[in-house]
From Swiss-Prot:
Deletion consequences: Abnormal flower and shoot apical meristem (SAM) development with fused sepals and reduced organ numbers in all four whorls as well as flatter and smaller meristems. Reduced levels of gibberellins (GA) but increased content of trans-zeatin riboside (ZR) and auxin (IAA). Coordinated apical shift of gene expression patterns in the basal proembryo, including auxin transporter genes and resulting in apical redistribution of auxin. Altered WUS expression from early embryogenesis (e.g. globular stage).
Protein name: GATA transcription factor 18
GO CC entries: nucleus
InterPro entries per UniProt: Znf_GATA (IPR000679), Znf_NHR/GATA (IPR013088)
Organism the protein comes from: Arabidopsis thaliana (Mouse-ear cress)
Length: 295
């Protein structure tokens, strides 16, 4: 027994073939399957609140929720559904590609933010100011690498090119090589001349034993005079002061005449025959034992 494709109710009928509910005023698309030239059809949409929405009109192929009871048949509506399916797939793939591109962009931003501090670090291979290109001229390393406006100049000859800068009266590296050598030689010559002047101005060392020699000579002169006059004396007293360290100090003792006669001791004939005994504590009158300071 063949089952009826419809279930009729008071509001309409339910089609078992398409699974849709139709009103009495409209017929199911199952009845129009054999009529391929039908220009209009009826579509029923299921709403989220459980109600039924029906739309009549020409071919509609923009809604993604379109449900047609002739999907299993080779009608133009089937081709439209296939196109809608392709369109949905392309839309979903486009959305997924957009999402993936969005996440890639976020990931790239995060990577850039992490590596940004290292990119701001200055490189050590940056251009460095060249040395010896402006200040030294053709002099090489001694010219000094600086700005041409601040080029080093010699304090004497005002040159800016020299193989070596030398110290001068204005401070270190204030003279060129030639002027520095001349300045150094002049400085040494001045120092040597100053030293010679100081040595020449020193007083000439005199004989520190001059007063001793004069006293020694005066002493012998007085002694000879006394001996020539024949005056006997017991202890010699010189009017001239003789230093305590003078080696010619001597003390003579004269014995009485009786002892002198008893001992038969006579002095030299030059003394007038006056006998006396001479005791000398140190023999300073002997030239072999006394140093002559006059030599």
């Amino acid at each position: 027994m063949m089952q009826t494709p419809y279930t009729t109710s008071t509001q309409g009928q339910y089609c078992h073939s398409c699974g849709m509910f139709h009103h009495h005023s409209q017929s199911c698309c199952y009845n129009n399957n054999n009529n391929s030239n039908a220009g209009s059809y009826s579509m029923v949409f299921s709403m989220q609140n459980g109600g039924v929405f029906e739309q009549n009109g020409e071919d509609y192929h923009h809604s993604s929720s379109l449900v047609d009871c002739t999907l299993s048949l080779g009608t133009p509506s089937t081709r439209l559904c296939e196109e809608d399916e392709k369109r949905r797939r392309s839309t979903s793939s486009g959305a997924s590609s957009c999402i993936s591109n969005f996440w890639d962009l976020i990931h790239t931003k995060n990577n850039n933010s992490k590596t940004a501090p290292y990119n701001n670090v200055p490189s050590f291979s940056a251009n460095k100011p060249s040395r010896g290109c402006s200040g030294g001229g053709g002099g090489g390393g001694g010219g000094g690498g600086g700005d041409s406006l601040l080029a080093r100049r010699c304090a004497n000859c005002d040159t800016t090119s020299t193989p070596l800068w030398r110290n001068g009266p204005r401070g270190p590296k204030s003279l060129c090589n030639a002027c520095g050598i001349r300045f150094k030689k002049e400085e040494r010559r001045t120092t040597a001349a100053t030293g010679n002047t100081v040595v020449g101005a020193a007083p000439v060392q005199t004989d520190q034993y001059g007063h001793h020699n004069s006293g020694y000579n005066n002493y012998h002169a007085a002694t000879n005079n006394n001996n020539n006059n024949g005056t006997p004396w017991a202890h010699h007293h010189s009017t001239q002061r003789v230093p305590c360290n003078y080696p010619a100090n001597e003390i003579r003792f004269m014995d009485d005449y009786g002892s002198g006669v008893a001992n038969n001791v006579e002095s030299d004939g030059a003394h007038g025959g006056v006998p006396f005994l001479s005791w000398r504590l140190n023999v300073a009158d002997r030239a072999s034992l006394v140093h002559d300071f006059t030599r």
